[in-house]
């Protein structure tokens, strides 16, 4: 199951305020139509833009980064009396290079469940990105729902991103990372089908990315704990789009700057962490083997061509 039409997405993504807005709600859920404004209004969007700065010539790692901020989590929990489940319709990851001679540079993104104590069972997907243009993109559509009352809701989707990083002066911003999500609260899995009738797991290498299989290197990366870089988060942004005959379209985003702080080696906080060796020294096997298009290994990381997708969800609740 393809999540997006690649040509259409690449055309739209550069003309939107938020990258996640390049994917229409109607592509994610079959009941998200012009004739159902209540459904369109219940689909929320949130995006994080992170500027990654160099630190003393080391490679850089974004580790244990959470998908939603506290405001989004609080909003979801306030709806728990009305809705039992949370579903992510799509998670979009974009990596942008902001330096010369970027072509051929590589890195890796690992998505995992931060509440799972077994890294293999908690692994969601991994991608190798290689810059052939200045931007790389991939998307994933989880099959499972989450509980709106889960005390560990903020941990359930976490990210680790390894960047190949040449030597630059301290605090030079070299990469931008955009992680956007469209989600909705529901009471029934039957409302989670796309307009083509699919409801199973999907991930898609949209541009400059290849899926990786779970292996020992990915396991150690998930378990890795190193001193983080300093995270400086700015005030959240609210994007409002006026619409005729419907309520205003409201989305939220946040901007984060990641750089080496004065206490980055001694103070343990969540966020970016320094890497002792540059990623370009890693061999292909250390990044992880590319995922087969017909294989779904434990801790799945499969491409959209996988023909053995899980079945559709069952109807067991009411419409949002």
UniProtKB/Swiss-Prot annotation:
GO terms for molecular function: RNA binding; serine-type endopeptidase activity. Residues 251-320 are annotated as: Disordered. Residues 278-289 have a biased composition (Basic and acidic residues). One of its GO terms (biological process) is proteolysis. Pfam families: MP. It is an enzyme of class 3 (hydrolase). May play a role in viral cell to cell movement by increasing the size exclusion limit of plasmodesmata and forming a complex with viral RNA to assist its movement. May also have a papain-like protease activity and cleave the genome polyprotein. It comes from the Viruses. InterPro entries: Trichovirus_mp (IPR001815), Viral_movement (IPR028919). Keywords: Hydrolase, RNA-binding, Transport, Viral movement protein. Its EC number is 3.4.21.-. The active site is at 144, 171, 199. Disulfide bonds: none annotated. This is Putative movement protein. Belongs to the tobamoviruses movement protein family.
